[in-house]
A protein has these predicted regions:
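N-terminal low-structure segments adjacent to metalloprotease catalytic domains
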Residues: 15-158, 165, 274-301
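A structure-centric signal for secondary-structure junctions around beta-strands
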Residues: 84-87, 163, 190, 252
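Short loop/turn motifs enriched for small/polar and acidic residues
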Residues: 91-93, 170-172, 241
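Active-site-proximal segment of zinc-dependent metalloprotease catalytic domains
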Residues: 159-225
Length: 301
């Protein structure tokens, strides 16, 4: 009997940096001075919403994670933008309708604001790049692609100019192993590549709900590529999730601690980022994102 997949993403690599990376960087970073947080991060901390006790079905109910302090983040090797690598790429695979293409473009715009890095959409690739041995018919007659093949045979060798992260988006359903029903996506954080399927996000005739899910999943996965572990204390886009229901329940906002981590290597203007997020959410009628961003802006005035 096939296993029912509840995980939004099956991780090709652990979300945590491996021991070898930690040991290699520990000697260099152990003496690094940890500066106190800037006033910005203290000001917006008031808007962090503490997570309640996990219940059956929640990610933290079945995954006893330890979290990641700011000090642990700083003293662990992670990816930061350089002049040679500072562009995020999205690679569509398949035949998308006009609404889906619009969503992919809106994801591009959002990621560019969220990470304050140039983000580009590569030329659409045909489903024909997936061979028969990496395809199957799913339990309700839908065609599925083997997610691991897309990572290792499509994305790993794809090196567009100045690539810092690459995420494929496919309109076909995905599966990670023969015995699993499906998976929403798969990622290799070591190689800074991931693939996500919009197939199961599109069931409801609700453009904004599907867009909101894409924004959360893409920013979450790319956040992992930049060294952010799962957030276990407050409602945050970096929370782990076991289902689409849990994804919908979690915030699109990056909490004050995760923002501070990201900003250490990216050195962007936090206020500029917030104002751009506010405009994006307003222009696209995304109420939850607009609400939490307005709260942060009010807190820093």
């Amino acid at each position: 009997m096939k296993k029912l997949v509840l995980l939004v993403f099956v991780f090709f690599c652990s979300c945590h940096s491996n021991k070898k990376e930690e040991n290699n960087s520990k000697a260099q970073l152990n003496s690094q001075q940890i500066l106190p947080p800037q006033p910005y991060f203290l000001d917006i901390k008031v808007n962090d919403v503490k997570l309640g006790e996990p219940v059956f079905g929640d990610w933290l109910f079945s995954h006893k994670e330890k979290g990641q302090s700011f000090e642990q983040f700083v003293r662990t090797k992670h990816v930061v933008p350089t002049k040679e690598e500072d562009i995020i790429y999205l690679k569509p695979i398949g035949q998308f309708n006009s609404s889906q293409l619009k969503q992919i473009e809106l994801v591009r715009q959002y990621l560019q604001i969220f990470f304050q890095l140039e983000t580009k959409v590569l030329e659409n690739a045909s489903n024909d790049i997936i061979p028969n041995h990496a395809r199957r018919i799913g339990d309700v007659g839908q065609e599925q692609f083997l997610a691991g093949y897309i990572l290792t045979d499509v994305l790993k060798e794809d090196s567009p100019d100045k690539r810092i992260a690459l995420m494929a988006i496919t309109e076909k359903d995905l599966y990670p192993k023969p015995e699993w029903n499906y998976v929403f996506g798969l990622a290799s954080y070591r190689d800074k590549i991931a693939v996500s399927s919009i197939y199961r996000m599109q069931k409801e005739a609700d453009f904004n709900l599907c867009l909101d899910r894409l924004l959360k999943i893409c920013s979450h996965e790319i956040g992992h590529m930049f060294g952010l572990h799962h957030c276990i204390e407050v409602n945050c886009v970096m929370n782990g999730t076991n289902s689409m229901v849990e994804t919908d329940r979690h915030s699109i906002r990056l909490c004050s601690l995760c923002q501070r981590k990201l900003n250490t290597g990216f050195k962007y203007d936090n206020v500029k980022r917030l104002k751009e997020l506010e405009k994006y959410f307003k222009d696209n009628n995304l109420a939850e994102g607009l609400q939490v961003t307005k709260k942060d802006l009010k807190s820093i005035q």
